[in-house]
Amino acid sequence: MPFPAARDRQAIVAFDRLELQRILDLYGRMVAAGHWRDYGLSFDGEVAMFAAFRRAAERPELRIEKRPRLRLKQGAFALVSEHGAVLKRGHDLAGVLAPIERRLMRLVAG
């Protein structure tokens, strides 16, 4: 059975190495603060998603999504709450992660 041609396969959206490094660095600090315990990654043709869980048996507390189709409109990156509300959207991953960074500072300080 022949392999499907490369042009027949749909491209998969994924985080690049620097984006994933930044996300996993934040995840590690949230784990050290005792706030997150598990994560999940999902990649398909439309979106790359990182989901952070407080406990493994729950819905994700936060999702970080990369949607390249929106890069010219609102920005490719989005921070989505547990209930599906978009908390922050932007072109720069650091700006989208800023609310979590601020929460981490409060967790560590308090």
Please report, for each region that a protein language model flagged, where it lies by residue.
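Mixed-charge, glycine-accented linear interaction segment located at domain edges/termini
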Residues: 78-105
